[in-house]
């Protein structure tokens, strides 16, 4: 926040100024170094910058009106036994010729992008009887171990966060949890976090994590005005 001196002139403390610059520098460097994945959609929002843009030009303003539906897929997730309405908000990603989506309850599904055929499905089995502050999941993240041989278990990993604050790693090939990640494929992020477990669960994960230089970074969602 700005500060004012005795003359009423707005000042910014040196410490705060340097903190802002320190935050901006890596952000600018990251944006300068990262290029959109030409022809792909390997991250939430299309690229590591989340620009929601593709350089492909096969579909344009001139021909978009002539497109026809090729296939349609239904997740089957209708919020059965849930105490709170939820919405489908996922942004699919396309990696190694597979389409990955997630439902509002963090069920992860891998599809054949050519036919819409379901290849595998993973259900984290969240407790649907609980009132979550927000019932949504906006997608998954993908990471490929460049040092692993092609075909090795969990060479390609799909990460998803859950409403009960778990971070789960799945084998992109078959959807099985990666046993070497956390506790048999999952980490409970709410352990050690002081939250009041009352009528509502206020600490959840609704957005996909970000992976930068081999480091997995995840945020969280909290429920407002629930107390």
Q: For the regions a protein language model found, what residue spans apply to each?
A:
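Bacterial N-terminal signal peptides that target proteins for export
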Residues: 5-22
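Bacterial N-terminal signal peptides
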Residues: 19-31
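Aromatic (tryptophan-biased) beta-strands that constitute blades/sheets of beta-rich domains
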Residues: 36-83, 117-128, 176-198
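Repeat-blade elements of multi-bladed beta-propeller folds
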Residues: 41-45, 85-105, 132-166, 201-226
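Flexible loop/turn segments at secondary-structure boundaries
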Residues: 50-51, 108-109, 129, 168, ...
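Hydrophobic/aromatic beta-strand positions that recur at structurally equivalent sites within the blades
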Residues: 59-62, 111, 170
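Residue-level recognition of short loop/turn positions
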Residues: 66, 96-98, 105, 114-115, ...
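Blade-loop segments of beta-propeller domains
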Residues: 75-93, 104-106, 110-147, 191, ...
């Amino acid at each position: 926040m700005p500060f004012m001196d005795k003359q009423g002139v707005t000042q910014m403390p040196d410490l705060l100024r340097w903190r802002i610059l320190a935050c901006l520098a890596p952000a600018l460097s990251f944006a300068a170094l990262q290029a959109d994945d030409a022809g792909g959609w390997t991250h939430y929002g299309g690229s590591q910058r989340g620009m929601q843009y593709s350089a492909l030009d096969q579909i344009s303003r001139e021909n978009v009106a002539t497109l026809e539906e090729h296939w349609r897929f239904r997740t089957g997730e209708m919020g059965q036994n849930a105490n709170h309405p939820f919405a489908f908000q996922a942004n699919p990603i396309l990696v190694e010729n597979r389409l990955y989506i997630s439902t509002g309850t963090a069920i992860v599904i891998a599809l054949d992008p050519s036919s819409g055929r379901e290849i595998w499905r993973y259900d984290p089995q969240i407790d649907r009887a609980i009132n979550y502050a927000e019932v949504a999941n906006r997608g998954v993240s993908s990471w490929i171990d460049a040092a692993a041989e092609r075909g090795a278990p969990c060479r390609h990993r799909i990460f998803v966060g859950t409403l009960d604050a778990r971070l789960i790693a799945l084998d992109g090939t078959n959807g099985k949890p990666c046993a070497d990640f956390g506790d048999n494929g999952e980490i409970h992020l709410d352990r050690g976090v002081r939250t009041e477990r009352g009528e509502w669960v206020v600490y959840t994960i609704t957005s996909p994590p970000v992976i930068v230089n081999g480091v997995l970074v995840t945020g969280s969602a909290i429920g407002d005005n629930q107390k």
